[in-house]
Amino acid sequence: MGITPTALEKTDKHTLVNLQEEFNKTKIQEVLDDLNQELIGLKPVKNRIREIAALLLVDRLRQKVGLSSSNPGLHMSFTGPPGTGKTTVATKMADILYKLNYIKKGHLVTVTRDDLVGQYIGHTAPKTKEVLKKAMGGVLFIDEAYYLYKPDNERDYGSEAIEILLQVMENQREDLVIIFAGYKEKMDKFYASNPGLASRVANHVDFPEYRPEELLKIAEMMLQEQQYQLTKEAELVFLDYIKKRMLQPHFANARSVRNAIDRARMRHANRIFNLSSKIVTKSNLTTIQAEDILKSRLFNT
């Protein structure tokens, strides 16, 4: 039942809502601050998440003062290349939804096609339903969601999983939020082929590629967490490494940076182990030199 003009007028005149106080109660700012600290760059993504959080908060305040409106669509699409923070942002989004009482538990369940689709008749439905059962009350994050749909194979069971997801998205919106993720071009085709699903996804967040300088900062942050550091020369060499690696196949942004760091640590350990003097300082153990990076195959091709 909607609010009459008279009732709305009374609400406007006599109901005061302290927006800052309500915002502080939710502790959403803590989540947004964590997002800023944990993720380098990605300003458009952070702004979009803040916009979604603002919509959800205002919707809750409207309900509080008796204003009627349909619930905002909560299902989302995260598009962008791998290693750009989609899973991290999904975790924070789950926390925001929980703090605003849109979901009951606030946990994140991450899956791919293999977790949902069976290999024979009658196998897909129980697999998908089991995943949904685990995710209820939280957020289900489906990575590389486009692999659910294989139009060139009429016997593929992915379409069965999609049908079950559609039913849950429509009928259990209060119990579960689904985030579909993957490369933008492939996700666009996926939605075009599944208009029923696309119409139920209200929030789209595009994750851009990192710039080389941002990836260097990510590397330094990863190293700092492990109590390592790069020399100034090593910083320049690592930046050069990133630029070269970005031109190679299967580049995965922060994931590729993490892999490069792991290999640099291995070379660093071998260099330390092979020192003529077996007495090493704390600085020796924590400092990665340019040579630890220059031994990469990228510099030898």
UniProtKB/Swiss-Prot annotation:
Binding site for ATP: 80-87
Role according to the record: Necessary for the expression of RuBisCO.
Gene name of this polypeptide: cfxQ
Gene3D superfamilies found in the cross-reference section: 1.10.8.60, P-loop containing nucleotide triphosphate hydrolases (3.40.50.300)
Pfam families, alphabetized: AAA (PF00004), AAA_lid_6 (PF17866)
Subcellular location: Plastid, Chloroplast
Protein name: Protein CfxQ homolog
GO MF entries: ATP binding; ATP hydrolysis activity
UniProt keyword annotation of GTP-binding present: no
Origin: domain of life: Eukaryota
Family the entry assigns: Belongs to the CbxX/CfxQ family.
One GO cellular component term: chloroplast
UniProt keyword terms in alphabetical order: ATP-binding, Chloroplast, Nucleotide-binding, Plastid
InterPro entries: AAA+_ATPase, AAA_lid_6, ATPase_AAA_core, CbxX/CfqX_mono, CbxX/CfxQ, CbxX/CfxQ_RuBisCO_ESX, P-loop_NTPase
